[in-house]
Design a protein with these regions (language model features):
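Disulfide-rich extracellular domains of secreted proteins
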Residues: 19-130
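N-terminal secretory signal peptides that target proteins for export/translocation
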Residues: 1-2
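Bacterial N-terminal signal peptides
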Residues: 5-15
Length: 130
């Protein structure tokens, strides 16, 4: 009887003791027009779907991508709350944003020094592994 009772308790507690299952989520944001030098422009929030937003899941890797017209460049950051990662190019992968998988991400863009022509950023995407 004691063994049976112990197994019953283990089966009830197991979901709480087991680590969160790995997974991924992806999101896209609408285009952003970056027009005024020195001003930061923010993408819309990139939100996880409900099932990926389970508490206890933490980001392992983030892949990002955005597009600009040929020959145009921007300063860009990928952010989770106030914590921002400077991006070295319009696509890449990083393990630096290892915060909660349920927290939204966003991009920030800025025209480089001396640039006066507006740039429209398209194809704004993330793929989050948790």
């Amino acid at each position: 009887m004691t063994l049976l009772r112990g197994l019953l308790w283990m089966s009830l507690l197991w979901p709480w003791l087991a680590p969160a299952a790995p997974g991924s989520w992806s999101a896209e944001a609408p285009s952003v027009r970056v027009a005024v030098p020195g001003r930061l422009y923010h993408s819309e929030a990139l939100l996880p779907p409900g099932d990926a937003a389970a508490r206890g899941n933490y980001i392992q890797k983030v892949r990002w991508r955005y597009s600009t017209p040929p020959g145009r460049s921007l300063r860009a950051w990928l952010c989770q709350g106030d914590r921002c990662l400077p991006l070295s190019g319009n696509r890449g992968i990083s393990e630096a944003l290892q915060g909660p998988a349920w927290s939204p991400l966003s991009f920030r863009f800025q025209l480089p020094d001396g640039e006066r022509r507006a740039v429209t950023v398209t194809d704004i995407q993330v793929l989050v592994n948790y």
